[in-house]
């Protein structure tokens, strides 16, 4: 089962990705997590990515495509995977298609911009694992602490309101065209496309996903 998640930053993709991973036993491949791991390791790619991400800009296609192709070739992706944050652009989608990767489901999470700004300013992240919480919608068991390790949670620089607005502008310009792209792919019989109302409660979205992916 090979799945792509579409939707603006903060649309709830990460939370639902956890649900899908646990339910179907496939890994989530988040370019954000891959880049954050590279940043933490202090690699050259990590340094380049950090400078761009701190400004709310996107990492260039060629860096991202190489990273993703290496990742989906690994053994844990044999039964499928979940792509979150990739592809972001039509050239990336074409590169994925050209590499012979067939996508079974494309899931779009639809949420208005103003809801996203409110959501993201309340987001807290466990840096080492990428686990994400929200002070209102999905709080940790202990305030400011990761449920699994008990380590401190942080507010990422790219979750600050002014950066969120910049990221949304970039999303609408670069990534929104993928909605049309994958709807066309679905009409051609190459994948299945579903749009979900991301303003619903987390459990309601999960139930809807369960029915779709079954």
Curated annotation (Swiss-Prot):
Annotated TM spans: none
UniProt name for this protein: Adenylate kinase
Protein task: Catalyzes the reversible transfer of the terminal phosphate group between ATP and AMP. Plays an important role in cellular energy homeostasis and in adenine nucleotide metabolism. It may be linked to the biosynthesis of lipopolysaccharide surface molecules, which are important for the pathogenesis of H.influenzae.
Similarity remark: Belongs to the adenylate kinase family.
Gene: adk
Catalyzed reaction equations: AMP + ATP = 2 ADP
Residue ranges of the region described as NMP: 30-59
Binding-site residues, AMP: 31, 36, 57-59, 85-88, 92, 156, 167
Ranges for region LID: 122-159
Entry keyword set: ATP-binding, Cytoplasm, Kinase, Nucleotide biosynthesis, Nucleotide-binding, Transferase
Biochemical pathway: Purine metabolism; AMP biosynthesis via salvage pathway; AMP from ADP: step 1/1
Highest taxon in the source lineage: Bacteria
GO biological process: AMP salvage; nucleoside diphosphate metabolic process; nucleoside monophosphate metabolic process
Top-tier EC class: transferase
Subunit and partners: Monomer.
Compartments it resides in: Cytoplasm
Any one GO cellular component localisation term in the record: cytosol
Primary localization class, coarse: cytoplasm
Binding site for ATP: 10-15, 123, 132-133, 200
Free-text comment on this protein's domains from its UniProt entry: Consists of three domains, a large central CORE domain and two small peripheral domains, NMPbind and LID, which undergo movements during catalysis. The LID domain closes over the site of phosphoryl transfer upon ATP binding. Assembling and dissambling the active center during each catalytic cycle provides an effective means to prevent ATP hydrolysis.
Gene Ontology MF annotations: adenylate kinase activity; ATP binding; nucleoside diphosphate kinase activity
PANTHER family xrefs: NUCLEOTIDE KINASE
EC numbers, comma separated: 2.7.4.3
